[in-house]
Curated annotation (Swiss-Prot):
Part of the twin-arginine translocation (Tat) system that transports large folded proteins containing a characteristic twin-arginine motif in their signal peptide across membranes. TatA could form the protein-conducting channel of the Tat system. Residues 61-70 have a biased composition (Basic and acidic residues). It comes from the Bacteria. Residues 42-70 are annotated as: Disordered. The chain crosses the membrane at residues 1-21. GO terms for molecular function: protein transmembrane transporter activity. The gene is tatA. This is Sec-independent protein translocase protein TatA.
Amino acid sequence: MGSFSVWHWLIVLVIVLVLFGRGKIPELMGDVAKGIKSFKKGMADEDQTPPPADANANAKTVDHKADEIK
């Protein structure tokens, strides 16, 4: 009752093949693989990006004396 038998999986496979067709499933898997590769490349690029040399070098400060409210 708790687990699926071979017949259950066979029926699910047939339904998936009917809905998506034989040509659509490899195309879908290829798109998933491209997404995974792109994600891994993005994660690797993020690790290789060096931090800025001095974060405060480009920062500008503004000194302003607030006027008193009467």
